[in-house]
Amino acid sequence: MFFQSILFLFSVLNGFFTIPKRGYAKECSNYRTIALISHASKVMLKIRQARLQQYMNCELPDVQAGFRKGEERAQIANILWIMEKGREFQKNIYFSFIDYVKAFDCVHHNKLWKILQVMGIPDHLICLLRNLYAGQETTVRTGLGTTDWFQIGRGVHQGCIFSPCLLNLYAEYIIRNTGLEEAQAGIKIAGRNINNLRYADDTTLMAKREEELKSLLMKVKEESEKSWLKAQQSEN
């Protein structure tokens, strides 16, 4: 069947362009790359994305609200509610807000394919994604000329409908490996221990004691570095 095919025929029509964000225009870090994708590619990707979304919804816990329909504002409301209850019952609650440096740009491709396998994503979907990212090259233009072309091995396509799902699964793998689900640190809500709330890669850690929060934070940082993500200085 056509839709079972794992060949991706339209990637040749795709391109990447840089868009200035803010700040000094000659600073590379002040630009964001965005993928421009042909209409034929978008039709194919939309069909595949709907299938990937089904697997993603089964794998992600309810503490993850990133890019999930109807959940966009849930975590802000949850954090505010927890803070209000802490004041009401005069309980100390410690928070740490983790923001990764350029998370979309730092996703390691080979690591991503392994994570998708661990998450139970079908081989034909993984193969399609690999084809979408295969053979990517870039060059850098400087005042001294243009560099040789070199392979790109990191970063998901910003502007592609697949990318939010891929980042969610990548971030979920990191949190699973930290063992936060089994950790005793956290706060009790309706008999359930909660120590993290997430929106994609943005993670809020919480605990009743400062030492517990530091322990959670170190676990997340260590696992993040193993997957080539770097956490910015957290706001506590």
Regions from the language model: what does each represent?
Residues 171, 184, 203:
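A shared catalytic/ligand-binding motif for oxyanion handling
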Residues 181-197:
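Active-site nucleotide-donor binding segment shared across nucleotidyl transfer reactions
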Residues 1-171:
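Conserved pre-catalytic core of RNA-dependent polymerases
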Residues 144, 231-236:
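Short, conserved micro-motifs composed of acidic
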Residues 102-119, 155, 197-226:
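Catalytic palm subdomain of template-directed nucleic-acid polymerases
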